Amino acid sequence: MKQKLALFFLLLTTFFVNGQILYSKAYGNIDSPAIIFIHGGPSGNSTLFEATTAQSLADKGFYVIVYDRRGEGRSIDSTATFTYQEAFNDLNKIYSIYKIEKANIIGHSFGGLVATLYSDKYPEKVKSLVLAGALFSQQDTYNHILKSVRQIYQIKNDSLMLKKVDEVEKLNRNSSEYRIGCFDLASKNDFFEMPHPTIKANNLRQEYKTSEFYKTNIRNSKAPVLFYKNEALNNIDTKPVLKRLKNKGVKLFAIYGQQDAIFSTSQINDMTRIVRKSNFLSIDNCSHYLFVDQQETFIKTIEKWIR
């Protein structure tokens, strides 16, 4: 009996594409409005969102689908190329497997780039696009990170780290080394951390760390390298694409943490103008992982926008 249940669970959460297994799972009623969550990366996964937020969002009356992109997280595939087209092909398969004609897509971090480009190519499949702490003008983000950390190290008179900033700035801007260098500096300075953790946020993170999801928090270190090797669109600005999407009938929304320090004020103003002020929310005491930092506000906002 246990073996049958295990097999049933496997069938629910994985499917084969080109001979490889992709992890996915649906939460909620299939007749409810569909939401597909696209995680960050390259080298990310959806375990944090799935463990903390997927079921809670489904409980509000949505059919929430999470998945790990090919070669990332639980979708182990040594032949993955990590291109956008590969991601699009697998996303189309998810639509087919879960019998979805049109979905609301939430794109988080790098997942926002995947979601934006997918929506541009297949607007007929996307009812609305929600950018959640999503990347959109990559070079502006890198410039902001480097400028910000330089100021921090100048105040601290940290000559060693100032030298590190100089080294990163000299790297090829279309390389994985440059991207990793920028985000490593951001991480060292807590750019992704909420400033004043709440009891709720702390509890969510602790529950995640003791869950089965955390045990499968797989990070493929080769993913960024292969993405930059195989994908020509590796440092892009999707603002023109987002403006075009509105003309294609895709509803646009954006939700960002006020203390998500990888985005400049200018970038946030740009995003607000694109989606319109009524479709934009900036959450206080919130950084990059806003669905954990301020989960209640995040879920209420999604419910309000795409109900």
What are these regions (language model features)?
Residues 58-74:
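Conserved alpha/beta-hydrolase
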Residues 42-54:
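The serine-hydrolase catalytic nucleophile loop
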Residues 101-145:
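Conserved hydrolase catalytic core segment
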Residues 86-103:
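Conserved acidic catalytic loop of the alpha/beta-hydrolase fold
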Residues 47, 69-84, 140:
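Glycine-rich "HGGG/HGxG" loop immediately N-terminal to the catalytic nucleophile
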Residues 248, 254-256:
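Short beta-strand/loop motif that positions the catalytic acidic residue
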Residues 286-295:
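Catalytic histidine-centered segment of alpha/beta-hydrolase-like enzymes
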Residues 131-174:
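Flexible "cap/lid" loop of the alpha/beta hydrolase fold
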